[in-house]
Amino acid sequence: ALSSAASDVYKRQVQDLRDAAAYLPHRVTVRAGDFPDLGACDVIINSVGKIELLYQSHDRLTEMDYTVPAVRSYAQKIKDSGFDGVLINITNPCDIVTRELALGLGLPRGRIFGTGTGLDTSRLLSALARQTGIDHKSITCYMLGEHGNQQFTPWSCVSFRGMPLDVWAEK
């Protein structure tokens, strides 16, 4: 179920997801809905945002004055729907909004995730694979910290085929 304030965008997103579902290996139902319908969902992707705010600044905190009040305005509606699944947050500032959702929904630990550094870890992994020619499945690396300008790579945790970066670099 999708729930959105922007009805034209909403309708296009519903259709895009319906079209994409044909390629999934399992049955997925995509339908338009509103907050009460979210109780029947297994997964919610939180993607509220106003991308125009980033046109003035590349700092993800710029979006906070919009996204945090938005989340606060509907978290109780999600909770009231009886939603008991997994929520994945992709909204910026990712860490802050994920925390707001956790507080507002009161779901058990491990049921609300923010994708912030997960996406950046994938980007780092892809870059290291391109640079080294090593298959990405043979590389271990992480981005940690707050998604955005405050994240970092703990280089001491990077390994190639199980070999620590410093050992690999000497070869």
Specify the residue positions occupied by each region the protein language model found.
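Single conserved hydrophobic/aromatic residue that forms the stacking wall/gate
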Residues: 1-6
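Conserved NAD(P)H cofactor-binding loop of Rossmann-fold oxidoreductase domains
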Residues: 48-50
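Short glycine-rich, flexible loops that bind phosphorylated cofactors or substrates
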Residues: 52-53, 96
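Redox-cofactor binding/interface segments in oxidoreductases and associated redox assembly factors
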Residues: 44-46, 89
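Short, surface-exposed basic-aromatic patches at helix termini and helix-loop junctions that form
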Residues: 18-22, 99-110, 129-134
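Conserved N-terminal Rossmann-fold NAD(P) cofactor-binding segment
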Residues: 8-41
